Amino acid sequence: MVLRGKTTIVAVLVLAVAGLALGLVAGHHRSKPSRAHARAETFMAGDRSFSVSYPTGWQASAVGATGAVLQRSDHRGVVLVRERPALKGSLSSLVKNLPRQLAKRFPDFHPVGASVARLATGPAVVYTFVRTKAAKVQTIVIAPTARRSVTLEAVAPAGAHDAAREAGQIVRSLKSR
């Protein structure tokens, strides 16, 4: 049986998502460091509230005192980092409302899944979805801390496995002050 149309696109994107999600929540354990680990620089927020490390081939720019945009030189990956006020509700209630909010924001939204990852800041929600018409895989990570939360959004084109892996390394490098 041959899949056609939207079903084919969704199937391909869901497979691509698996790579992005694994890159975000699981470290790569190899005897040799990956190319992305070869050299890294660190971006520190203007108010010094957080920092992230990023590999060669990425550039970081400040967005005000509490945000950053990190983008690959070839534009095949981007990570947005924003400091937010402390969460008022639980992580589970946040995840419950997220699909509805994202469906309003992105007409081609297709949810893939949610999980919890352990970052240096503590437990974080990882919510991954595809945008079928845009052929993008997107992951939102919400990392609460005692005084604030940090939201990271990683976006990569379907099939950009190296960009997804590097975006995952950036997310996992988050440190909050």
Residue ranges, per PLM feature:
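Hydrophobic membrane-insertion alpha-helices, especially the h-region
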Residues: 8-25
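C-terminal region of N-terminal signal peptides and the immediate post-cleavage residues
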Residues: 20-41
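Extracellular, beta-strand-rich glycan-interacting domains
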Residues: 170-177
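N-terminal "mature-domain start" segment
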Residues: 35-63
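Conserved polar/disulfide-associated segments of primarily extracytoplasmic proteins
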Residues: 2-5, 29, 35, 60-169
